[in-house]
Structure formats: structure tokens, C-alpha cells
A protein has these predicted regions:
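Active-site gating/metal-coordination segments in enzymes
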Residues: 1-92
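A short acidic, amphipathic alpha-helical/loop segment
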Residues: 15, 52, 98, 156-158
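H/E-rich (His + Asp/Glu) clusters that bind or coordinate divalent metals
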Residues: 74-95, 102, 106-181
Length: 181
């Protein structure tokens, strides 16, 4: 979606509709941090995003929550910024009632959910302490994780702790991170 710092996401709703209706898109990329690592946008659960979410629900399309590059030297884009954003998105969903307002809204968190699978017990405990729904109930029809984690042990952990109905196959574009497993 076309997003810029300080520009309301309602401006992206028309482009989402055009892409779905005219070009056959089946989802969109939602950048929770168009500032490039300075995090100036409201949380993903803030009403700031609601006009876009209304359009996503109307069109029945999910959003992949994925930041773009980092202009902040504290956060390497692929090694920190991406994974921080994945983890942050999950925590924002855990602490708010977004899915009560939008029961049909769907998000895909890439990179196996960032640190979420590794700290599933921490998030389960936080949900209990905060009197939130069980994690399995929280994500049931709304939050999905992909398998793009670059090595089999990471995929194994993801499949062990996250409900299987919430895991989608995902692979990376050629060349994002190169290595041999």
C-alpha cells in the first residue's frame, strides 16, 4: 500500500480497493512504521487504522504486516527492524480489543512472528496477567504466521508452539538473506 509518515491510512483504502477489484490482488502489505525505524505511527490497534481495516474486511483480504527499510542506524533492516516489527505487532494485538471491533479482520505476521514463538510462554503469561483471552483464542481467526524463518529448527519451533491452523507456508524473495542450512 502507498504509505508515508504522517499520512492517514484512509488514503490507502482507495488504492487497496483498486488493486483488489481491478488487478485481482488477494491481500496487501501493511507497514506499521512508514517512518523507517522511528515508529511515529499509532499502534496497529489504534482507531487511526480503522478506515483501512473497514476496507480490508469489506474486500475480504488480509494484510501482511511488514515494515520496509530502516533509516535508523540502531535497527538493521533485515536483522532487527523486521523482527522487531513482527514481535511488536503481535504484542499490540495481544493488548487490545481490535478483533472485537473487526472479527473478520486478518493479519499475517511474517518471519514466523519474529520472537513470538520463542517467547510463547511469556506472551501466554502476559495474556493471563492482563486478563486477556488465551493466545489460541486471541489469534484463532485473525492472526497467522508464515514459515519464513530460514532454518528447520525455527520452523519446528513455530509448528510446535503456534496452533497449526495459524501457520501458513512462506518463503523469502531470492537474495534477502543468503546462507546454507
Amino acid at each position: 500500500l502507498p504509505q508515508s509518515p504522517g499520512v492517514p491510512p484512509v488514503n490507502s483504502a482507495a488504492e487497496l480497493e483498486r488493486c483488489v477489484r481491478e488487478l485481482g490482488f488477494i491481500g496487501c502489505n501493511l507497514n506499521p512504521d512508514p517512518s523507517g525505524g522511528h515508529w511515529t505511527s499509532p499502534t496497529l490497534t489504534d482507531r487511526h487504522w480503522y478506515p483501512l481495516y473497514e476496507k480490508m474486511v469489506e474486500l475480504d483480504v488480509p494484510a501482511m504486516v511488514h515494515v520496509s527499510s530502516s533509516c535508523n542506524s540502531n535497527f538493521h533492516a533485515t536483522g532487527a527492524h523486521y523482527l522487531n516489527a513482527d514481535t511488536t505487532a503481535f504484542m499490540q494485538f495481544l493488548t487490545a480489543d481490535l478483533f472485537k471491533d473487526f472479527p473478520a479482520l486478518r493479519f499475517i505476521i511474517p518471519h514466523g512472528g519474529g520472537a513470538v514463538p520463542f517467547h510463547w510462554g511469556r506472551y501466554r503469561g502476559l495474556a493471563q496477567d492482563l486478563k486477556r483471552p488465551l493466545l489460541e483464542d486471541l489469534i484463532k481467526n485473525n492472526v497467522f504466521f508464515d514459515t519464513c524463518v530460514y532454518h528447520q529448527p525455527g520452523i519446528d519451533l513455530l509448528l510446535k508452539v503456534v496452533p497449526l491452523d495459524n501457520v501458513l507456508f512462506g518463503s523469502e524473495m531470492v537474495g534477502a538473506v543468503r546462507g546454507i542450512d
